[in-house]
Amino acid sequence: MTDNSQIKVIVGMSGGVDSSVSAYLLQQQGYQVEGLFMKNWEEDDTDEYCSAAQDLADAKAVCDKLGMKLHTINFAAEYWDNVFEHFLEEYKAGRTPNPDILCNKEIKFKAFLEFAAEELGATYIATGHYVRRDDSTGRPRLLRGLDTNKDQSYFLYTLSEAQVGQSLFPVGDLEKPEVRRIAEQLDLITAKKKDSTGICFIGERKFKDFLAKFLPAQPGPIETVDGKVIGEHQGLMYHTLGQRKGLGIGGRKDATEEAWYVVDKEVERNTLVVAQGEHPRLYSDGLIASQLHWVDRTPIRAPRRCTVKTRYRQEDIPCLIQPIDDETIRVIFDEKQAAVTPGQSAVFYDGEVCLGGGIIEQRFSHPV
C-alpha cells in the first residue's frame, strides 16, 4: 500500500454527504486530511433562505467527528466578480447560462485550489464530485463518475490536465447509495441530508423571485410560430427552450389541446415564440460552440467523431465535430435534437473520457 502519510489533502467541505464521505475515505487511504468550508455568497438578514450557516455547522460537526481541522474562507467577492455578474449578463442577453460550471472553473478549481496549495501547503484538493481521475496513460484524464445517474463530469469540463492532476475525487468510484451507507455507518450528521439543488452556492430559492432582485422585468409578446400574439411574458430570462409550464396561455379556443412549448427566444424583438406539440422549430441538426476548453488543452484541428451532451443528465448524442478555428466548432448531430439552448454548455466524450466542451452560441436546423 502506498504511504500517503506525508501528503496533505484539503477537502472542500460543503456540509453535504458527498464531501463528508470523501474526507473519511481519504483518511482511510492514509492522507493528512483537513477541510475547507467556502462561503461564496453574502446572505442578508432578511433572506428567507439562509443555507450557509447550517452548511457550516454540518461541515464542522463532520470534521469534529472525523478528528479533522476545518478552515473557512470567504470567496464572496470572487464569486460575485467572476461568476454571478457573468450569470446576470447572460440572462440579460436572453441566454440560459450554467453557473455551476463557471463556479467550478473560477472558485472550486481556481480560488480554492490556489488557496489550498499556497496558504495551506496542500499537495491535492479533493471534492465530493462524482467523477474519476485516470493516470494510466501518464497524463491525468477526467472520466465520468461510476454512478451514471450522478456523474458530474458535465460540470467539470473546463478543468485542465494540471487541475485534474491536483485533484482527488474519492466518491467517483462509488454509487450514491453506497456513499449514504458509509455516512450512516459512521453516524455522520450529513448521512440523510438531501442533495443541494439550485444555483451553485446560492441555494434553493424561488428562481424567478431571486432573479427579479437583480434584473428588472422586461415584458414582451408571446407569439406563435405563425406570428400571432397570444400573450405576454415578463422577461425572456424566465423561460427556456422546451419549457411547457408557466406560460399562462393554456385553454385557448382557437387552439388544440396539445401542450404549448417554448420553441425560440427572439432577443432582438424581446419575443417568446411558442408552438403546440413537437414542433420542428424546437429541433436542431447541430450547434456552433465557442469559449472552448479541452482537458488536454489541445485544440481539435481535424473533424472528429465523439458524443456530446447539451445539458446535464442527457443521453449521449453521437456527433461529428468540425473545427471552424481554435476557438469555435461546428457540431453536427447524427439525429435531430430538441431544445438545444444557447448559453448552455456542450460537453464532449470519447467513451468514459470527458474531452472538454464549450458554450453553445447558436443552434441550426441545416448545416451552416
From Swiss-Prot:
Chain residue ranges for the region called Interaction with tRNA:
150-152, 311-312
Where's it found, cell-wise?
Answer: Cytoplasm
Q: What is its EC number?
A: 2.8.1.13
The site annotation (Interaction with tRNA) covers 129, 344
Name a GO CC annotation attached to this entry. Answer: cytoplasm
Q: Where is this region: Interaction with target base in tRNA?
A: 98-100
Q: Which residues bind ATP?
A: 12-19, 38, 128
* Disulfides per UniProt: 103-200
| Name this protein carries in UniProt | tRNA-specific 2-thiouridylase MnmA
